[in-house]
Structure formats: C-alpha cells, structure tokens
Amino acid sequence: MDLTQIQNPSFLKDMSISELEGLSEDIRKFLIEELSQTGGHIAPNLGVVELTIALHKLFDSPKDKFLWDVGHQSYVHKILTGRAKEFGTLRQYQGLCGFPKRCESEHDVWETGHSSTSLSAAMGMALARDLKKTKEYVIPIIGDGALTGGMALEALNHIGHEKTDMIVILNDNEMSIAPNVGALHNVLGRLRTAGKYHWVKDELEYILKKIPAVGGKVAATAEKIKDSLKYLLVSGVFFEELGFTYLGPVDGHDYEKLFETLQYAKKTKGPVLVHVITKKGKGYKPAESDVIGTWHGTGPYKIESGDFVKPKEVAPAWSAVVSETVLKLARTDERIVAITPAMPVGSKLEKFQKEFPDRMIDVGIAEQHATTMAAGMATQGMKPFLAIYSTFLQRAYDQVVHDICRQNLNVFIGIDRSGLVGADGETHQGVFDISFLRHLPNMVIMMPKDENEGQHLVYTAMQYEDGPIALRYARGNGLGVHMDEELKAIPIGSWETLKEGTQAAILTFGTTIPMAMEAAERLEKAGVSVKVVNARFIKPMDEAYLHDLLGKNIPILTIEEACLIGGFGTGVVEFASENGYHSALVERMGIPDRFIEHGSVTKLLEEIGLTTDAVVDRIHTMIPSKQKRA
C-alpha cells in the first residue's frame, strides 16, 4: 500500500484482519526505511503498529481523543492521519515534528514530549466532555515506563475516585527508554503471568469447600488465605483497587484479541484500563534485541547491518566527560553516589553502574523523587551526583527550591543537555535552567568552556561543601582539547580572560565561547579591539572582575545559549544598576521569549540570530566608530 496516499484513518473501517496485517508490514517497512535516513524513535513505534491501527479502526479520531504519553510513539498515528509524505522532513527545521503537534493535525489533540502527562490531560478532557454533555471517547495511551511517574499515579487515583468514563491503554513493553525499575514494574510483571492465578484460585476454592464448618477460626483463616492469594496473584488487582475495570493482559500484536478487548472496553462504564503487551522494536531485529535502550531513539543507520551512521568523533561527549570524572573521583571517595531518573545510557553512567552498582541509583521516570532523595542522602554526609537533563529538571523545581536550596544541602546537579538540543524541539530544549536557578539562594551555577575545564569543574563541585552546586553541559561532543591528568579546584565565582581588548568586551560561557572568539578575531582584523571573558561561573558572578570592567566604561555584550529573561545577561545588567554604573552600555544576546522549535542546532542558532556574524554586527553598532566592518 502507498502510505503517502493516506488522507485520514477512515479507510481502516472496511479492512479485514488479513488486510490489516499487510498494512502492518507496510508501515514497519516504511518506518525502517524512512528513519534509516532521518533518525528518530524507531523502536517505540515499531512496537505499537497493530495497537495504533486497532485504535483508529474502532474509534473515530478526531472526535474520539487519542493522547499519546511522551509522544515519541506517535509516528504510526501520524501515518494514518495523512502525514506519511512528510516523513522525509522528520525532526528537521520546519519539518514534521517527532511528537504530536496540535498545529500539524486535528488528530493531534494533545502535545507531549515529557512523560506521565497524558492521564491528567485526559481527565481534563473527559470532565469537559461531561460538563458539555457531549459523547466521545477519551483514550490516553501510556507506557509502563511513564506509568512510574508520580503525576501519572496521581491521575490514576483521581480518575478512579471520580469513576470518570475513560479508556486508558497501558502499552507494556517492559521498557521505557532503558529497562524499567521499581515496584510497579514488578506488579506489571506479575500481571503478565497472571493466568496462573485462575488455576490456583479454582484449586483453592475446591479445597475450601472441603473444610468442615467447625468454627469461626477455621473459616476466617481460610478467607484470609484466599484474600492473600488474590492480592499476590489476581490479574489487575492494583488497578481494580484504584477504581478501574482492568482488561488484559492482551497481545498487542494480535488483531482479534485487540478488537475483542477494545470493543468490551467501549461498552464498559467508568474508567477502564486495557493492559496491552507489545514488543519494542518489533519487526526489525537490531531494535528487537536491544535491552539497554540504544534503539529507543537513533540517528541514521544502515538497515542491513544495523550500524549507526555517525560522523567520526574527534572529541568525547560532554556527558561522558562529566560522568567519567565523577567515576574517577568515586574510586577514592565512597561517599559519592550517582542518581539518574531513567537516563543511565543518555547520561553515560553505564561505567559507573558497572563498577559501583550499589552506588548508582536509577529511580525511573521520577525526577521529583530523585531530587529529594539526593537531598536526603546529602543530610547523611553522602555526596550525591544528580545527573538530569535540563528539560527534565523543570519537573523537579519545587524539590530544588524547597528541599535542596532552602536547606543548603551539598547536592551536585549535573544539568545535561543544557542549551539547544535540536531535533527533539520545543519540549526538550535546555534553555530555561539558568532563569529558574539563578535567583535561588545558595545555588552555584557553572558551565565550562571546554571538556578540560569541565573535568576541573566536576572536581570543584565535589570539593564544594557550602551548599548546592550545578554544572551545565551541552548535548554532543566537546572540542577535542588536551585533558590534564591532575584535577584541580577552580575558585568559586572566578572568571578568566580569553582575549584582551580595549574597545568592547564580550562576556559568555560554554558553547558560545567559540562564537565569541571567532567574532573577536574578525573584529581585531577590522581594527576593533574586543576583550573576551569566560564567565564560567554564572552564579556567583566574578564581582571584582565586573567592577573593573564596568569601571572602564566600555560597551559590554553578553551572549548565552539560554533564555534572555532572567538569564546571565540580566544578572550583569542588575549588577551594573545596583552598583551605580548607570552609564554602562550592556546589551544581551540569547534565546528570545518564545519556545524554540525542532531543527539542527546550527539552523536554530541562525534563526534566532545567535551567530558569529550577528555578534560582529552587534559590536559594530555598540561602538561609535567608523571602523571598516569585518
């Protein structure tokens, strides 16, 4: 079937099961071929082909509402709703988004990117439906990994209490990104083998009937045994106790079983949970055999071999530099522990986990818990390293404020994927953390200019004992600089001069330093002398350096790959104002007041005007001179 000719899912209504099976093969082949060129979330989508087709066949989107938790598994949904022809642009600038996008299609009723939000949103839609007295199904689709998130459990509790009509699809592939952890994962594991319960229950009931009625104690004991067995083995008791009708487990690749179960769910009043067992990566052997999450989301790859197409790496990944330095320090300091909310692979903590399994803690998709747990460990003299993506640190903001900063606890937060991350787009850009951390009392924020300085700042963080400290580091690789053998502590709040200059100054840090250096060199050739400062401590700032610089009364330009509002540049302006430098000319470059879409980082920087050319032009406008332009 030519999938690019699909306009909407209505064609599914008249298809037989054998035709649907053929469609499944076509979709898997299409996804494997298309994503080999663009990259994307291949394994999650190969696992939900039959489930997505079944949902679109039995329900009427967009009248009936599908909410895809996290959203990375929505590619099949996009194909069935008329977007197959756009897959060549997947996750590229102004191309097809890798997550549901309301402006893309009326079938995308809820936008996602972070996990565990679908049930709360579905509850809101269902309550609105009931208040408006309309009739449509609300169907959130959530994975077993996302179900470990506290927000999802809060929603389950509320939905069950209110007895709201809703069909929750639990897509259980036994993995989120990496293998799942936690007690709830173990509960689901028991449910997968719950068929054993029915045989044991029947045998127990037969035995109980043989017990003579000789006294209350025997009868009571027998009932307790029966109840205990129920809570150990009964299929779906966890969800039933929350107020849901539990259906399953059902084979998520068997159309007949899916249809039978979903039709029953449609007729059932109140909240229903359909437990669907799927195989992540189904239909592509390299993805099917992946047990650590390598094929969850990928770049381009070779279909036949399953090898990834990657440019030759000349420098280590930022995540690896940080995690390996933490590991090096952990070998001589037993107080150091590493904590991750379900991202051990992305945060490059596999080596730490292998060497110190008891000191490496993966809490699952539970950022709030991870953050406060780190705080608790700090109260007992441990040195917790919390490795968390910038975009996911947002989910634990109150815990950072209330539990870490307020108590001034020695927690080292590794803020991975800081700055623009590119193809994952609006939901994943790491551009807000400076703005929401800079104003917190006791917090120290750093970002290195290169990987060598990065390892020294990790050492600095582990030596720091005066409260919380955060290290920002970007997605991707470093610069390939020489790495010192011996680690050293860098004085807190100290900046360094990278290039001397007398006519203007650029204050910046991290990934924008090469841009600033190139701009300054071009300006030098044009006769404009510009100082470049590595403001590696975003907070506290180097106040002595700032006093000296502002006293020279030269134009200052701040550059940051982060939000302008509340950012580093704002801090410099505040310092100048509060210290009486009222004639100071300070201008800022950074991320404007909007969400930044998906695309390559280079393209996005061009689009927002954060380039070497733009820096050169800005400096020229700031200096009252007729110097020849660079």
From Swiss-Prot:
MF GO annotations: 1-deoxy-D-xylulose-5-phosphate synthase activity; magnesium ion binding; thiamine pyrophosphate binding
Reactions listed under catalytic activity: D-glyceraldehyde 3-phosphate + pyruvate + H(+) = 1-deoxy-D-xylulose 5-phosphate + CO2
Group of enzyme by EC: transferase
Gene3D superfamilies: 3.40.50.920, 3.40.50.970
UniProt EC number: 2.2.1.7
PROSITE patterns according to UniProt: TRANSKETOLASE_1, TRANSKETOLASE_2
Cellular component, GO, one term: cytosol
SMART domains: Transket_pyr
Family statement drawn from the similarity comment of this UniProt entry: Belongs to the transketolase family. DXPS subfamily.
Function: Catalyzes the acyloin condensation reaction between C atoms 2 and 3 of pyruvate and glyceraldehyde 3-phosphate to yield 1-deoxy-D-xylulose-5-phosphate (DXP).
Protein name per Swiss-Prot or TrEMBL: 1-deoxy-D-xylulose-5-phosphate synthase
